[in-house]
Regions:
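N-terminal short leaders/motifs
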Residues: 54-77, 176-206
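C-terminal regulatory/interaction regions
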Residues: 265-271
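Conserved beta-sheet core of the metallophosphoesterase superfamily
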Residues: 104-109, 122, 127, 133-143, ...
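Short, solvent-exposed loop/turn segments at secondary-structure junctions
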Residues: 16-17, 53-54, 92, 128-129, ...
Length: 271
């Protein structure tokens, strides 16, 4: 797929709508909807790269209440013919077919490659990739297990959602609200994952979320495969979040930039 002149592809992640409370979430939702409205005129495609919600469980006949402004804007963009893709994150992995049926938005449960304007993108939320974090990887297998999803699904929605929201609040209280810190190339698991992929094939842009840091990192070539398809250095892009940074990536057919809707470009980590 090649972009038409003056058209762009946008990438966003980690809205965590629903957290930390209704008032703060609603304010953030309005900002996100404003941004989506402003890009409608030149968006050729939009990728939502996980953790749109702080928690989401989709019952067969019931979905969580709220988020009507966001859903309305996504429906408007989708109905206007703009393709939208959604990758589940660790906070909203329990999605079924609501997005596909109601919004015509496909849902992906694992990283996926796309090619645009002869550039190769590997896109995913980023949770559970790379070495380490074995406890979470085991937990993810449990959460993705159909039997576990069924057991949660037989709880009445008022009980299930109440329990999930309580655990989400407790998790935030335990982890605190301090900013994440870049650990360096050797300790960032997603950079290690990118390097491993580049040993096998060429990728121009790795697009992930999950880390809650805005990162634009040029990866060192590790082999004859360790560059992008055009021979340039591959780049690992982490999309940050819409809690502190309001960051997003945009691709114009030639160049990809990591930007902030709130002017927080000075917070972007680059090498």
């Amino acid at each position: 797929m090649n972009l038409l002149p003056n058209k762009k592809i946008y990438f966003l992640s980690d809205f965590h709508l629903g957290a930390p409370n209704h008032a703060a979430s609603l304010e953030r939702e309005k900002i996100i909807v404003q941004f989506l409205g402003e890009i409608k005129h030149d968006a050729a495609e939009i990728f939502l790269v996980g953790d749109m919600f702080d928690f989401w469980y989709e019952y067969r006949q019931v979905v969580p209440k709220g988020y009507v402004r966001l859903f309305g804007k996504l429906a408007e963009l989708s109905d206007a013919g703009i393709p939208i893709h959604f990758f589940v994150g660790n906070h909203d992995m329990w999605m079924r077919d609501y997005f596909q049926k109601e919004l015509n938005i496909p849902v992906y449960y694992a990283p996926k490659e796309f090619e645009r304007n002869e550039k190769k993108f590997l896109i995913g939320h980023g949770d559970g990739l790379g070495p380490g974090d074995h406890g979470y990887k085991r937990l993810k297998k449990i959460f993705r297990n159909p039997a576990c999803q069924w057991l949660f699904g037989i709880l009445p929605p008022v009980v299930g959602m109440g329990l999930a929201n309580y655990l989400s609040r407790r998790s935030r209280a335990q982890t605190g609200s301090s900013e994440e810190i870049f650990l360096g190339e050797e300790k960032e698991w997603l950079i290690t994952y990118c390097k491993d992929v580049l040993q096998q094939r060429s990728i121009d842009f790795f697009i992930f979320g999950h880390r809650h840091l805005a990162i634009d990192y040029r990866l060192p070539p590790l082999s004859s495969q360790g560059r992008g398809a055009g021979g340039e250095a591959s780049r690992y892009i982490n999309l940050g979040d819409w809690i502190r940074y309001y960051t997003y990536a945009v691709f114009d057919g030639k160049n990809l930039e990591l930007k902030s809707f709130k002017g927080n470009e000075n917070k972007i980590i680059r090498n």
